[in-house]
């Protein structure tokens, strides 16, 4: 998949089996449409843990970085709906990263997504970025893969929002590598093995934290009726 715009919000969290059905209903029919009606939001996608675990990965693609601090977005973050207020406490082990899209290669939306959370060794940022860019550029041409991207977290300097207070505080990832494709085995082989080892050799602080997901739902702003 080609990422839309130049900024993104990348999130990971766990949902218990007892809450999953209501969560997916709320997230698909209220929360995603609400977010996609915010000016500058281009597309949202929700990905479920491939192994059937409790984890979800959610990605919002935005026109530009300044959308993260826009009055329209902050208004929603500080005035959640009653259903959102009910569901937010069920987001366990929340990681929420507000990012600039640094590199994006490929096209289309694959069925699977592998996420790698990476932190550079201080002083190795440029070397690590060069290695990531070089490797990601070639990956979408490999059978089984369709997209490869690098996001870098840059958190806006804002006061804590109402949604964050409801969840009890969010952790933050650093750099995020996303690989998408239609063959989960190829995705894992390249992402968890070859790419992960290359990143450590190029200046990643430790082995990237990897997880693989299957597409659950996607909604673009253009999908909504005017």
Can you name each region flagged by the protein language model?
Residues 1-226:
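Macromolecular interaction modules
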């Amino acid at each position: 998949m080609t990422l839309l715009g130049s900024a993104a919000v990348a999130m990971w969290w766990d949902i218990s089996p007892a809450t999953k059905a209501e969560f997916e209903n709320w997230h698909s029919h209220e929360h995603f449409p609400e977010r996609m009606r915010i000016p500058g939001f281009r597309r949202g996608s929700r990905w479920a843990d491939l192994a059937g675990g409790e984890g979800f990965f959610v990605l919002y693609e935005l026109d530009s970085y300044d959308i993260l601090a826009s009055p329209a977005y902050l208004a929603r973050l500080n005035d959640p709906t009653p259903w959102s207020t009910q569901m937010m406490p069920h987001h366990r082990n929340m990681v929420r990263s507000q990012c600039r899209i640094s590199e994006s290669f490929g096209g289309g939306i694959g069925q699977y997504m592998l996420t790698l959370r990476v932190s550079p060794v201080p002083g190795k940022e440029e070397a690590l970025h060069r290695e990531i860019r070089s490797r990601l550029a070639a990956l979408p041409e490999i059978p089984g893969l369709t997209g490869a991207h690098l996001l870098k977290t840059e958190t806006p300097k804002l006061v804590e929002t109402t949604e964050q207070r409801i969840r009890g505080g969010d952790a933050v990832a650093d750099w995020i590598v996303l690989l998408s494709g239609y063959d989960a085995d190829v995705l894992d082989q390249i992402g968890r093995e070859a790419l992960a080892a290359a990143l450590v050799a190029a200046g990643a602080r430790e082995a990237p934290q990897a997880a693989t997901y299957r597409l659950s739902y996607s909604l673009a702003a253009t999908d909504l009726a005017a």
